[in-house]
């Protein structure tokens, strides 16, 4: 039942996320979902009934879906169409590498220290990840960015396609002309 309720929480969140993402930016939504996961995992230490466990797994399903589902939007916003397949593959591989570490860790901690205790280190890991995301993901994550290309010749095709006096703006994605996000 717990996994079923996790899935139910996840699906219900996925159904309402399009409306939520129309009103709030991806950063706020995804960090809120991660905060739900962090709080839920810390609360897991105090679960003392089966019904409490079921409620917890429902809430964790919500947090998981809200924190993970918009990932595809970020990849589409951040990369040119030529690079998206590689980024989606990298995200898939990275998420599975994280699971490859987390699943055995949860099993080992549960076996050696108990299931309730295991919620605490998992909550700490989630809190650290959320804190890093909060620090490195800019609050003003604009898609159109004013920038310059000091490294390109003045007759470069990219520069000629934009009106500029040394600087120009357009939907900014990582590609061969934009190797890094501007500071």
State where each predicted segment sits.
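C-terminal transmembrane bundle of multi-pass solute transporters/carriers
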Residues: 1-140
